[in-house]
Amino acid sequence: MLEIFDVRYDELTDIRSEDLYKLRKKTFKDRLNWEVNCSNGMEFDEYDNSDTRYLLGIYQGQLICSVRFIELHLPNMITHTFNALFDDVALPKRGYIESSRFFVDKTRAKLLFGNHYPISYLFFLSIINYSRHNGYTGIYTIVSRAMLTILKRSG
């Protein structure tokens, strides 16, 4: 069974954080060719800090999927990295989180679950459940066109 749970940045073990950041490099730099900060085969940035929580999907001890959460009133990608791309957009300061660095490792997922296990959909539901369980009003995120298509299919 796929276990999905949340951890604070400070709770990540060295082994788990190395796996997380290596899979993020594989996804965002190697596969999607994004301009991201990479070092020692890992992708991480200034938003991976003590203000951050992660939702992790683990199966048989292997990390399959993850997303990063930061409360919207704290420094995050929307208000800091991408703010120049938007005109004067007023975002709520409290009650919302920003999600970023969503990924599902396709290779591991196919190897462990085959082609017919809806990991992305299950993970989207887990993100919504996390938000509701922790009292957030909603989630803000910036997505690529491909991710927008996946989100629309999810409902």
Task: Indicate residue ranges for each PLM-predicted region.
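Short amphipathic alpha-helix that is part of the acyltransferase structural core
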Residues: 1-43, 54-56, 63
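Short loop/turn segments at secondary-structure transitions that flank enzyme active sites
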Residues: 26, 73-75, 105
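Beta-rich nucleic-acid/ligand-interaction surfaces
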Residues: 42-46, 147-149
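A short helix-loop-beta-strand connector motif used in the catalytic cores of GNAT acetyltransferases and
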Residues: 45-56, 74
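Short connector loops at helix/strand junctions that flank enzyme active sites
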Residues: 50-52, 64, 92-97
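Short, His- and charge-rich active-site/binding loops that engage polyanionic ligands
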Residues: 60-90
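Acyl-donor binding region in acyl/amide transferases
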Residues: 82-155
